[in-house]
Amino acid sequence: MLDSNLAPDARAARRILLASMVGTTIEFYDFYIYATAAVLVFPRLFFPKGDPAIATLQSLATFALAFVARPIGAAIFGHFGDRIGRKTTLVTALMTMGISTICIGLLPTYASAGVFAALLLALCRIGQGIGLGGEWGGAVLLATENAPAGKHGWYGMFPQLGAPLGLVISIGAFLLISNQLTEAQLFSWGWRVPFLASTVLVAVGLYIRLQLVETPAFKRSIAQGERVRLPFNVVFGKFPLRLFLGTLGSTTTFVVFYLANIFALGWGTNSLGFPRQQFLIMQMLAALFFGLMIPVAGALADRIGGRAMLIIATLLIIAFGFAFRPLFSTHDIAAVFVFLACGFGLSGLSYGPLGSALATLFPTPVRYTGTSLTFNFAGILGASLAAPIATYLATHYGLAFVGYYLSTAGFITLIALIFIKGEEK
């Protein structure tokens, strides 16, 4: 279980929670602008002309590369986070993500560099994945290891707020340039602006994080001589079942979010015929439910427990799977918005307590590594595969099967969460 800390003073607490939230906001902004561009822009700019569906799948494949890279980032940054400290590691992770994102904004396209452009895009995407792989676990520990007793769920949800904030800002960035630029300007140079704008955001994030001090739990662990030589080996050697169950217990959180985000954007604009700007506005408004449900879930987690909150959210997600065909099969604005709001809202309900719940699975000397690996392995299973699988199922078998896919993932997560109870103790 997490160590109990004395409550930090109000000013220090605000600084800690702001740093954990701002950092993840920037990281997820960088991550999501790629996701949006992978559906709307990159198929035309970085891949050969031909079948638009094939180009979109190729673009989504580069999107999925980051999820493969994220466990690598988790292992690298987790190692140093558990050995030299949370603060320095978080600063480095933010810089890795920021540099990779800025480089995407400077890349040549297929028209000028051919297949080399797609390879460079993939390389930058891997860099994004490595950076985010090291970011999330450290941000969660920055918050939870500073939390007073009985407040781990509340503190742990602050870095989670970075996901909806980053999503809304990224969608807003693409909406802004779409409204201000012609289609020719957007595909010529306008798409680069959201990536290059990350320079300012990263500078702000670095300034805030450099003001931090190390967490009390890490200081105690080092003072007691608990530093381990290879945290990665300890996690796999001593806690493989916790890693396995934690991964499966987190997977559906990713599946439901990326179905409501990436899959829905592609299907809504390409198959249902919604204009790009209209659908982005609907997603941005629906994403507010994502942000609203995170603090609700965090507060409830402190009352009933993080695992119990995750079980409730998972049961609701399983039920939501059966609403795919009724709500998302026609050009009905009201039905589609309800679908998006439910999808994003349930994402927040499960995502809010996830950080504090996963942090309880591992002791302080390997907590950064264990928590990061668990989260990012779940990303591979849930996020990287969700949009391609859903696109294939919807195209060949219909939307109902996309819902069945979500419900099946939810059932597997539910079983894992039931068994996690024994491991948590």
Predicted segments, located by residue:
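A late C-terminal transmembrane helix in Major Facilitator Superfamily
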Residues: 365-394
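Glycine-rich segments within core transmembrane alpha-helices of 12-TM secondary carriers
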Residues: 154-178, 375-386
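Helix-to-loop junctions at the C-terminal end of transmembrane segments
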Residues: 74-86, 294-306
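Multi-pass alpha-helical transporter architecture, strongest
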Residues: 205-212, 408-425
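C-terminal ends and interior cores of transmembrane alpha-helices
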Residues: 95-113, 315-330
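Cytoplasmic membrane-interface "Motif A"-like loop-to-helix N-cap segments
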Residues: 83-95, 303-314
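Extracytoplasmic gate region of multi-pass secondary transporters
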Residues: 35-36, 240-289, 383
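C-terminal transmembrane helical hairpin of 12-TM major facilitator-type secondary transporters
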Residues: 307-353
